[in-house]
């Protein structure tokens, strides 16, 4: 006769096993699927001929034209990019890559956002976890991401936040697991027409859309006073990645991806993280190249114009980047000295930026903390405010140190687009007015190099008031 307690334990074990199977099913088939991540994972699991693997986030997926690079360097390449993937995802996807492939080179592609936190967003987890082959690897990846933020329940029950909305979406997800490429061809007419999966992990975006408005409205220089460096957890994961690659017998290259110029000029820590990563790699036998410091003769700065959002380029830009990478990598493989293609440090890089990327306006608050990112002196702004008796708006811009900017303010009619001058061109970038005189109205500022030609596209619209949101562009 079985002991009652033992029967209870068996029932509990059966319940937990059943729950685990239900959760695993829901997290696999009942969540929305990133079509391009699914295709990437399906192809990498089917391949065994990969000689060079690029591992990273959507930056890899959208910018490394693997087939083009393969033809140019004479080695079979694959772009293993998972959107929103951080180092935990890079480690898990590389383990998946190594199940059937033994690449000669594993190139870990990192951007500052990869190392500004040790946490991987659930968005990256839901793109990757369902497509890992082994339940053990799924659990190992799940634990690696959950231990950093403590979201064990949220991460275990992904389907609560990313559930399919219809039976059709459910069947689409099932199809992407069982017959991914046939399903892709079937549903392709319903997908974003701008995006095409080209194979070997590369997804190409073809659109006339550009990030001009996003750059204008969002990339505003900040000052935090914070010292940016790699987190201890980040250092541990980088060493874990190095050891994983070494155990496979592959050669590692850490590649710091070059984002658009405005990011380098404006975002706190953007270049600091890259410099910290370069130092860490040098101290730990990890070859590293910082493409953020690539000179125009290697990587043309005109690629800024090919971004369709703040981080991703259209296919033309990806082709230019891929060609630049090929030029570098072929020389690197040949043992050539490539140092002349790169600026020695950030100051040399900054000095090479001889233009203005974007400008903006912000309100001065006498009682608030001084904005250390402003080029104006605190005394000049305070004097213009007459001890808070007048409203003051300060204009600034992202530019290289060789550029001396000047600004001109206008009052803009949002309905017609008509502009009335408020100032002449001035280097101070300060607009002062009677208290409340411009509240709720639209101020437009233009920026240019002092004495230079006007650039009608280099402007910023600003509505003083409670919300202080950018004006509607007409």
Q: What does each model-found stretch correspond to?
A:
Residues 125-248, 340-361, 370-374:
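Secreted/periplasmic serine-hydrolase-like ester/acetyl group-modifying domain
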Residues 421-428:
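Short beta-strand segments within Ig-like beta-sandwich modules, predominantly Fibronectin type-III
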Residues 266-360:
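C-terminal regions of proteins
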Residues 242-269:
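Active-site segments of SGNH/GDSL-like serine hydrolases
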């Amino acid at each position: 006769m079985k002991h009652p307690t033992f029967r209870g334990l068996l029932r509990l074990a059966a319940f937990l096993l059943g729950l685990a199977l239900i959760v695993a099913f829901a997290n696999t088939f009942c969540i929305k699927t990133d079509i391009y991540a699914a295709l990437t994972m399906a192809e990498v699991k089917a391949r065994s001929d990969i000689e060079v693997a690029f591992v990273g986030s959507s930056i890899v997926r959208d910018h490394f034209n693997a087939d083009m690079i393969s033809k140019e360097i004479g080695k079979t390449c694959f772009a293993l990019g998972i959107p929103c993937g951080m180092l935990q995802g890079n480690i898990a996807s590389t383990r998946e890559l190594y199940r059937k492939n033994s690449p000669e080179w594993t190139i870990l592609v990192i951007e500052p956002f990869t190392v500004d936190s040790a946490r991987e967003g659930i968005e990256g987890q839901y793109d990757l976890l369902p497509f890992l082959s082994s339940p053990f690897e799924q659990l190992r990846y799940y634990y690696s991401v959950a231990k950093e933020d403590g979201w064990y329940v949220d991460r275990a029950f992904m389907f609560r936040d990313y559930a399919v909305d219809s039976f059709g979406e459910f069947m689409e997800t099932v199809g992407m697991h069982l017959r991914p490429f046939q399903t892709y061809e079937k549903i392709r007419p319903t997908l974003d027409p701008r995006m095409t999966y080209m194979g070997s992990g590369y997804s190409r975006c073809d659109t006339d859309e550009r990030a001009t408005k996003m750059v204008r409205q969002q990339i505003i220089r900040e000052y935090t006073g914070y010292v940016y460096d790699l987190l201890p957890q980040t250092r541990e994961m980088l060493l874990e990645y190095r050891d994983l690659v070494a155990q496979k017998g592959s050669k590692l290259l850490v590649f710091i991806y070059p984002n658009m110029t405005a990011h380098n000029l404006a975002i706190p820590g953007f270049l600091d993280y890259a410099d910290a990563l370069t130092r860490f790699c040098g101290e730990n036998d990890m070859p590293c190249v910082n493409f953020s410091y690539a000179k125009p003769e290697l990587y043309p700065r005109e690629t800024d114009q090919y971004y369709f959002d703040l981080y991703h380029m259209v296919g033309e830009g990806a082709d230019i980047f891929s060609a630049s990478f090929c030029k570098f990598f072929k020389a690197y493989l040949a043992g050539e000295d490539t140092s002349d293609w790169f600026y020695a440090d950030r100051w040399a890089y900054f000095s090479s930026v001889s233009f203005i990327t974007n400008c903006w306006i912000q309100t001065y608050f006498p009682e608030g903390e001084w904005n250390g990112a402003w080029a104006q002196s605190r005394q000049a702004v305070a004097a213009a405010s007459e001890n808070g008796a007048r409203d003051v708006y300060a204009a600034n811009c992202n530019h290289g140190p060789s550029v001396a900017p000047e600004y001109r303010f206008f009052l803009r009619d949002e309905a017609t687009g008509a502009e009335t001058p408020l100032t002449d061109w001035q280097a101070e970038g300060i607009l002062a007015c009677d208290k409340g005189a411009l509240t709720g109205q639209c101020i437009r500022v233009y920026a240019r190099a002092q004495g230079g030609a006007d650039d009608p596209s280099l402007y910023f619209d600003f509505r003083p008031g409670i919300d202080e949101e950018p004006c509607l562009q007409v």
